[in-house]
């Protein structure tokens, strides 16, 4: 064990916890720390005290256990810690994470879908894996602003073009003049 690992073992002994669960060379000191923190809070660390998880994944699982959410939904090594975080936050808000708790979306896309779900908006317009997270954000913002998003939910528009169309709709402008993929976002902004 290196000095950092030894320090985690000492802290565990000092706090009267069973260090045998994490005093293993397979865990780096940050992973040991996540397991120790869970043990100190009397959590079932067996869910994440596994070499297949990184320290960051372990942290997301530990935080979910602390909040009492069903971590089995995301305690899977094929989810990055960032994806785990989006699923955990969704569970904490008591939303149906099944819409985005899969590897079809990256963590930024998951965040946009989660934000739409939290405010109770029609997430199926946002949860389209053909859109990147920035496009999803423009769609979500349009829904929140009660705009006719059908005028720009087209994968031919990049997110910056979508933003220019959304901003025009927000100001009740005639966007038909510039809502065309042939105009780049700078041109759209000038016309708007």
Specify the residue positions occupied by each region the protein language model found.
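General marker for long, soluble alpha-helical cores
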Residues: 1-192
């Amino acid at each position: 064990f290196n000095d950092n690992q030894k320090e985690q073992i000492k802290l565990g002994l000092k706090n009267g916890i069973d260090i045998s669960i994490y005093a293993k060379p397979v865990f780096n000191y940050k992973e040991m720390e996540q397991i120790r923190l869970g043990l100190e809070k009397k959590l079932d660390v067996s869910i994440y005290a596994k070499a297949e998880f990184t320290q960051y994944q372990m942290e997301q699982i530990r935080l979910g256990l602390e909040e009492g959410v069903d971590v089995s939904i995301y305690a899977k090594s094929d989810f990055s810690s960032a994806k785990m975080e989006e699923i955990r936050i969704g569970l904490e808000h008591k939303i149906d994470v099944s819409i985005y708790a899969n590897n079809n979306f990256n963590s930024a896309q998951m965040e946009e879908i989660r934000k739409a779900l939290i405010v109770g908006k029609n997430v199926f317009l946002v949860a389209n894996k053909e859109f990147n997270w920035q496009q999803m954000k423009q769609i979500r913002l349009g829904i929140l602003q009660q705009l006719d998003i059908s005028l720009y939910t087209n994968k031919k528009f990049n997110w910056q073009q979508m933003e220019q169309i959304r901003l025009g709709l927000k100001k009740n402008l005639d966007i038909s003049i510039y809502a065309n993929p042939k105009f780049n976002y700078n041109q759209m902004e000038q016309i708007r």
